[in-house]
């Protein structure tokens, strides 16, 4: 229950946070806010539909759009170097722990 709360109950907020950050990055790179937002929303919709409909593991889908020495692998390397994967795991663990606290009346 607590794990499900951490993953899906709070999941939309994590997604919105990532969209917000990617929109800000697009603005930093010179795109107008509306265009940056629309590009990331469309990319997210496409990725979600592909993930749902393909039945493929996310790693396989990511690898399919990652060219050797290309832009995507450069970005993925930066995400890994900055600990984004570990931060997401730690965030979900914190949400799970907080869910447990709230369930026991320690909130």
Regions found by a protein language model. Give the residues of each.
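All-alpha amphipathic helical-bundle segments outside canonical DNA-binding/catalytic cores
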Residues: 32-38
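NAD(P)-dependent Rossmann-like dehydrogenase/reductase catalytic/cofactor-binding core
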Residues: 41-107
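Hydrophobic alpha-helical context, especially transmembrane and signal-peptide helices
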Residues: 2-4, 34, 82, 86
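Conserved Rossmann-fold dehydrogenase catalytic segment
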Residues: 1-13, 32, 57-58, 76, ...
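Active-site-proximal catalytic alpha-helix in oxidoreductases
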Residues: 1-27, 38-52, 70
């Amino acid at each position: 229950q607590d794990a499900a709360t951490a993953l899906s109950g709070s999941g939309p907020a994590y997604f919105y946070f990532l969209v917000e950050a990617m929109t800000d990055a697009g603005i930093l790179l010179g795109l107008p806010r509306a265009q940056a937002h629309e590009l990331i929303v469309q990319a997210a919709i496409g990725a979600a539909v592909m993930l749902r409909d393909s039945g493929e593991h996310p790693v396989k889908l990511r690898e399919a759009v990652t060219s050797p020495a290309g832009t995507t692998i450069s970005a993925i390397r930066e995400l890994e170097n900055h600990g984004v994967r570990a931060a997401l795991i730690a965030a979900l663990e914190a949400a799970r722990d907080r869910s447990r606290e709230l369930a026991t009346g320690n909130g």
